[in-house]
Amino acid sequence: MRLIETTIDIQATASRVWGILSAFSAYPVWNPFIIAAEGEVRPGARLKITIAPPGRRPMTFRPLVLVAVPERELRWLGRLLVPGLFDGEHIFQLEQRDAACCLHHCERFSGILLPLFGDGPLQATRQGFEAMNAALKKRAEAD
């Protein structure tokens, strides 16, 4: 298993941050990493997500929503072809801290193909997470 973890403090409520994270139709306006997202934010829903990691070609996949708790957590599982080949569990967790919200944004990768991917794609994904986090912070903190 490989894990990418990022965290950012946002001077906004968890409610505001959740509102931005769950409004998929606005992603093309502000999100430099997840450039398109479609589907319902509810457990069991199938999403259509297009990511654009820095320096890499965009990729579209159809993950399954595992957890959707407003103002707390959004989690989905994406798979390459069949379970266990290459899986990615993408997690957004929101933690309210007084007037600020801490966003924990991570992904757990697993599967038999994982050793073949090397560090390049995972580094690009980390950079994409950090760019998305910064853009989310900017949008949430705007008046």
Feature names for model-found ranges:
Residues M1-R42:
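Hydrophobic ligand-binding cavity/cleft-lining segments
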Residues T6-I8, F61-V67, G88-Q96:
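Hydrophobic/aromatic beta-strand elements that line small-molecule binding cavities or substrate pockets
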Residues D9-T13, T50-A52, E95-R97, C106-S110:
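Solvent-exposed residues in well-ordered beta-strands and their adjoining turns
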Residues E38-P83, R97, A134-D143:
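Glycine-rich portal/gate segments that line the openings of hydrophobic small-molecule binding cavities
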Residues P63, W76, H90, H104-E107:
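Polar/charged side chains located within well-ordered beta-strands of beta-rich proteins
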Residues C102, R108-D143:
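A conserved amphipathic terminal alpha-helix motif
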Residues P58-T60, L85-E89, L113-D119:
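A short, polar/proline- and glycine-enriched secondary-structure boundary/capping micro-motif
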